[in-house]
């Protein structure tokens, strides 16, 4: 599934007249780059969610005969459903016995997506591609790379289904969801050295074992909320590819760099 419904506010004024998915990089729209990457990896069915200038995306796919693939449109023109709600709405399009790879439309990388799917076979519930890039928001993982929480290092906010991340025992005892750290605990990793603080890449694989959980969620929610709600019950595993080259093309000042990035990947 390709997330292409976003408003692309960080790419204004380009997105005043087109969807983010059709912003060109290296002579082709972002959507083209992601579709071809999926096609090269052997994917045959792709769901693309649409909202902002949705018809432009539909027309682009029609003009290219869906690139020879089975491409389905998950229409969110009535209202953006966010990343989690977008998956929930699109689930009927998928084989309920097979995993789904989710890919943000504005992510370029050197990832071998076929290998990502193979790696995900060792994780029963979900595989999250992560990296050590600098950001304000991080996912928190234990030594075995199982997801334990989320933090905003700028505000000090921590979200986790565990009562505390400061003691070893807390990593095994579930409690009230999203119990925050005390306000003075600004750096949660410092309180629990075994936790790793890693940035989410916008690429992840979800297995059928957790598909039923989406029915318990509202129609509109973020996928990180989903992962945090259930990470104490299911195996949501982070995967860090050490030779990863990845770029988020989400801002105007990254477009020029993105073209050079693509050239370097070739």
Regions found by a protein language model. Name each.
Residues 1-16, 37-41:
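N-terminal nucleotide-binding beta1-loop-alpha1 segment
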Residues 2, 24, 28-104, 115, ...:
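Conserved N-terminal catalytic core of the sugar/cofactor nucleotidyltransferase
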Residues 7, 105-107:
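Active-site metal-binding loops of divalent metal-dependent hydrolases
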Residues 11, 57-61, 214, 258:
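Hydrophobic packing residues within well-ordered alpha-helices of enzyme cores
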Residues 127-144:
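Short beta-strand-to-loop element that shapes/binds the nucleotide-sugar donor at the catalytic cleft/hinge
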């Amino acid at each position: 599934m390709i997330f292409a419904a976003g408003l692309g506010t960080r790419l204004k004024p380009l997105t005043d007249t087109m969807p983010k998915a059709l912003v060109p990089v290296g002579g082709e729209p972002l959507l083209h780059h992601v579709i071809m990457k999926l096609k090269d990896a052997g994917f045959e069915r792709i769901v693309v969610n649409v909202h902002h200038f949705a018809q432009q995306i539909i027309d682009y796919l029609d003009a290219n005969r869906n690139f020879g693939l089975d491409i389905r449109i998950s229409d969110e023109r009535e209202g953006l459903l966010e990343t989690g709600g977008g998956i929930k709405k699109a689930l009927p399009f998928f084989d309920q016995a097979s995993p789904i790879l989710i890919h943000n439309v504005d992510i370029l990388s050197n990832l071998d997506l076929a290998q990502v799917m193979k790696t995900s076979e060792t994780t029963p519930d979900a595989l999250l591609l992560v990296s050590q890039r600098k950001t304000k928001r991080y996912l928190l993982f234990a030594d075995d790379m199982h997801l334990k929480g989320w933090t905003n290092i700028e505000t000090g906010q921590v979200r986790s289904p565990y009562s505390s991340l400061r003691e070893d025992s807390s990593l095994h005892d579930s409690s009230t969801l999203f119990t925050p750290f005390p306000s003075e605990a600004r750096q949660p990793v410092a309180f629990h050295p075994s936790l790793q603080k890693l940035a989410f890449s916008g690429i992840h694989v979800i297995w059928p074992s957790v598909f039923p959980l989406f029915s318990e969620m509202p129609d509109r929610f973020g996928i990180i909320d989903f992962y945090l709600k259930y990470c104490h019950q299911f195996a949501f595993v982070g995967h860090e590819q050490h030779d990863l080259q990845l770029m988020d093309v989400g801002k105007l000042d990254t477009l020029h760099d993105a073209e050079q990035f693509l050239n370097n990947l070739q």
